[in-house]
């Protein structure tokens, strides 16, 4: 199964893309994703996309044109690590949202609650 793109930004086209399949996300979350992606591409260059893999994990994918002297590959890796730390709660929430609404997974806590109510 192919990865599902959540959003992305391009330093070349100066554009932000948001997958409308995720339109049910709160506006403040969409705005935060836009700011995060656009600032990344303005800082490092290239193209950044956030994609869900088949297990529901959010992946940061980067690419750059070969002729892009401005693109900083080392800076890119560091910036992604920083974003993954700074935005940890947001990213984990997005993964949970995807797993529940797109993959049909029920979180362990919910299963435990259901099991507890059955036993009562």
Predicted region positions:
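Negatively charged, low-complexity tracts enriched in Asp/Glu with abundant Ser/Thr
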Residues: 1-43
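Amphipathic protein-protein interaction modules
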Residues: 44-100, 105-110, 114
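Intrinsic disorder/low-complexity signal
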Residues: 115-120
């Amino acid at each position: 199964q192919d990865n599902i793109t959540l959003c992305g930004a391009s330093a070349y086209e100066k554009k932000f893309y948001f997958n409308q399949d995720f339109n049910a996300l709160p506006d403040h979350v969409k705005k935060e994703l836009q700011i995060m992606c656009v600032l990344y591409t303005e800082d490092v260059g290239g193209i950044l996309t956030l994609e869900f893999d088949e297990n529901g994990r959010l992946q940061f994918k980067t690419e750059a044109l070969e002729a892009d002297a401005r693109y900083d590959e080392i800076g890119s890796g560091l910036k992604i690590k920083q974003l993954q730390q700074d935005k940890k709660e947001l990213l984990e929430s997005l993964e949970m949202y995807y797993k529940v609404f797109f993959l049909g997974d029920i979180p362990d806590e919910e299963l435990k609650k259901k099991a507890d109510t059955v036993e009562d």
